[in-house]
Amino acid sequence: QLHCAGKAKRSGSHAPLVRELLLDALSPEQLVLTLLEAEPPHVLISRPSAPFTEASMMMSLTKLADKELVHMISWAKKIPGFVELSLFDQVRLLESCWMEVLMVGLMWRSIDHPGKLIFAPDLVLDRDEGKCVEGILEIFDMLLATTSRFRELKLQHKEYLCVKAMILLNSNMYPLVTATQDADSSRKLAHLLNAVTDALVWVIAKSGISSQQQSMRLANLLMLLSHVRHASNKGMEHLLSMKCKNVVPVYDLLLEMLNAHVLRGCKSSITGSECSPAE
């Protein structure tokens, strides 16, 4: 289980109800402000002075991802209602979406820089720099294409905040818990996802466009999430491949997340005996 997912449990039998009522009391505007306050800080990674090699680029990217994952867990816990889900559910959601959240954050940072990927303020990559890493150019192209579409839509910061939270809350395709673990967990999650969706609808409505344009914009934004998921799947496959080939060592929280992905794949695969978590 995620060692950073939080150890604090609910204090008092009425705490979950009280916090749920607090979520109900938040207006869409207040929820968006809460998401803004939850935003993680920029992470620095310091680009190597020498030209990138396959190993050095993958090392920079995995170090950055590991640092960002720690902040991602803190971010998720600041979303109103998230810590009221069972710890099991919190972990499963984060394990299911972490690559997507990293990628949509990358897209947002890169939105005003056509042709570039702003992994960090001090790690800006051109598309062609990916040529030194086998298989990563396809992923760079997917990231740049989806970022370009967000740019065409003139994605606003508050829209981005809502979309990123929705990626987290809508990330797990399988039932999260059994009735014996937490009977109302699915209800809590659906309630929270609805609240964030309402916040996104409110943000779009505040732009002043017509009702028809609002509906179209919402649809266009949500349709792009499948592209983020596709890029995430490709990124996960590539990272596993790089690790299996010993191109780059993977440690700490990133290794934990990667192993969780492998184990989930084993459980859902008929040929599960062929899978084994990375060591």
From Swiss-Prot:
InterPro entries, per database record: NHR-like_dom_sf, Nucl_hrmn_rcpt_lig-bd, Nuclear_hormone_rcpt_NR3, Nuclear_hrmn_rcpt
Cellular component GO terms held in the UniProt record: chromatin; nucleoplasm; nucleus
Span of domain NR LBD: 27-261
Family: Belongs to the nuclear hormone receptor family. NR3 subfamily.
Subunit structure: Binds DNA as a homodimer. Can form a heterodimer with ESR1. Interacts with NCOA1, NCOA3, NCOA5 and NCOA6 coactivators, leading to a strong increase of transcription of target genes. Interacts with UBE1C and AKAP13. Interacts with DNTTIP2. Interacts with CCDC62 in the presence of estradiol/E2; this interaction seems to enhance the transcription of target genes. Interacts with DNAAF4. Interacts with PRMT2. Interacts with CCAR2 (via N-terminus) in a ligand-independent manner. Interacts with RBM39, in the presence of estradiol (E2). Interacts with STUB1/CHIP.
Role noted for this protein: Nuclear hormone receptor. Binds estrogens with an affinity similar to that of ESR1/ER-alpha, and activates expression of reporter genes containing estrogen response elements (ERE) in an estrogen-dependent manner.
Domain notes: Composed of three domains: a modulating N-terminal domain, a DNA-binding domain and a C-terminal ligand-binding domain.
Protein name in UniProt: Estrogen receptor beta
Organism encoding this protein: Macaca mulatta (Rhesus macaque)
Gene name per UniProt: ESR2
